[in-house]
Curated annotation (Swiss-Prot):
Role description: Part of a complex that catalyzes the reversible reduction of CoM-S-S-CoB to the thiol-coenzymes H-S-CoM (coenzyme M) and H-S-CoB (coenzyme B).
KW Oxidoreductase (keyword) present: yes
Assembly: The heterodisulfide reductase is composed of three subunits; HdrA, HdrB and HdrC. It forms a complex with the F420-non-reducing hydrogenase (Mvh), which provides the reducing equivalents to the heterodisulfide reductase.
Gene behind the chain: hdrB
Gene Ontology process terms (BP): methanogenesis
Catalytic activity: coenzyme B + coenzyme M + 2 reduced [2Fe-2S]-[ferredoxin] + 2 H(+) = coenzyme M-coenzyme B heterodisulfide + 2 H2 + 2 oxidized [2Fe-2S]-[ferredoxin]
Keyword presence, DNA damage: no
Protein name per its UniProtKB record: H(2):CoB-CoM heterodisulfide,ferredoxin reductase subunit B
A single GO molecular function term of this UniProt record: CoB--CoM heterodisulfide reductase activity
Source taxonomy: Archaea, Methanobacteriati, Methanobacteriota, Methanomada group, Methanobacteria
Pathway where this protein functions: Cofactor metabolism; coenzyme M-coenzyme B heterodisulfide reduction; coenzyme B and coenzyme M from coenzyme M-coenzyme B heterodisulfide: step 1/1
UniProt keyword terms in alphabetical order: Methanogenesis, Oxidoreductase
Organism: Methanothermobacter thermautotrophicus (strain ATCC 29096 / DSM 1053 / JCM 10044 / NBRC 100330 / Delta H) (Methanobacterium thermoautotrophicum)
Recorded family membership: Belongs to the HdrB family.
Length: 302
């Protein structure tokens, strides 16, 4: 299996450990990740798409044409990128008039959208194509952690089009997390937004942090060791947001934040240097130290 790998903007600029873990994981699974040379921003669906649908669709379609030339479906591990590219692909496949309009724009760049490929999310590929049994085979260090899974908004919705899992009571990420040996802990308002999306973080940080703080309180009450997400923007909001909440409101949480790929990386035995967790604002060391201590106490560890 091979797939075109859409990096997006935040992951490779702020959290390169997500990409590193993904490349190692897919190499072990025998899946070839093909780099999309010349890809742009997705662009953000709740920002660009809300005030200039044509420009948004044209930029997204240009990215999709790169994958079409490569003859591969697109994979992203960012909910925003997934939502934007999936929605644009669906729109242009269904709306012939819009497709013709966008192709007139793309013609100026020597490109044409053909509607030949699909847009997919990392988590969905791991669950449906790889499968839990095969994924469990790459786990070398089972993780005895209690984690709060954050689904985010664009991974499952609009559910009529995306149709990955039940949008209100999903289990796909919980099951993927538990392959690593970690426990997905239920918590209040689990499906609530991280607070950053739709331009809210840029427009009114206090409002965005109010959402984040509510989720963090619920997670803390559930007694979790870490937060696991499938979106670098949500990742940033929980990671950087904890520092901002501390500065603005004086409330501390100190809950480490990991992308699903990084959690799987830990379970594969990757060192923290490869996961680039030092780039995180919230220190992950306490979480890693807990795992090391459990390893030392495990029967047969010597």
């Amino acid at each position: 299996m091979e797939i075109a790998y859409f990096l997006g903007c935040i992951m490779n600029n702020r959290y390169p450990g997500i990409e590193k873990a993904t490349r190692v994981l897919f190499d072990k699974l025998g899946i070839e990740l093909k780099d999309m040379e010349g890809a742009f921003c997705c662009p953000a669906p709740g920002v660009f798409g809300s005030f200039d649908k044509t420009t948004w669709a044209a930029i997204a379609a240009r990215n999709i044409t790169i994958a079409e030339e490569m003859g591969s479906d697109v994979m992203t591990e960012c909910n925003g990128c997934f939502g934007s590219l999936f929605e644009a692909n669906h729109l242009l496949k269904e709306d012939e008039e819009m497709r013709a309009k966008i192709n007139e724009i793309l013609k100026e760049a020597g490109r044409e959208y053909k509607g030949e490929i699909n847009v997919r999310h990392l988590a969905e590929i791991l669950y449906n194509d790889v499968g839990l049994d095969k994924l469990s085979e790459v786990v070398e260090k089972p993780l005895n952690l209690n984690v709060a899974v954050h689904y985010g908004c664009h991974f499952l919705k609009p559910s009529e089009e995306i149709n990955i899992d039940n949008p209100e009571r999903p289990t796909i990420l919980d099951e993927l997390v538990e392959v690593t040996g970690a426990k997905s802990v239920d918590y209040k308002d689990k499906m609530m937004c991280c607070g950053a999306g739709g331009g809210v973080r840029s427009r009114d940080l206090d409002v965005a942090l109010d959402f984040t703080m509510e989720k963090l309180r619920n997670m803390k009450e559930a007694g979790v060791d870490a937060i696991v997400n499938v979106c670098p923007f949500c990742h940033l909001q929980f990671d950087v947001g904890q520092m901002e909440i501390k500065d603005k409101f004086g409330e501390e949480f100190d809950i480490p934040v990991l992308h699903l790929a990084q959690l799987l990386g830990l379970a594969m035995g990757l060192p923290k240097e490869d996961l680039v967790v030092d780039a995180h604002q919230v220190c992950v060391d306490e979480c890693l130290e807990k795992l090391e201590e459990l390893d030392r106490l495990a029967p047969g560890s010597g």
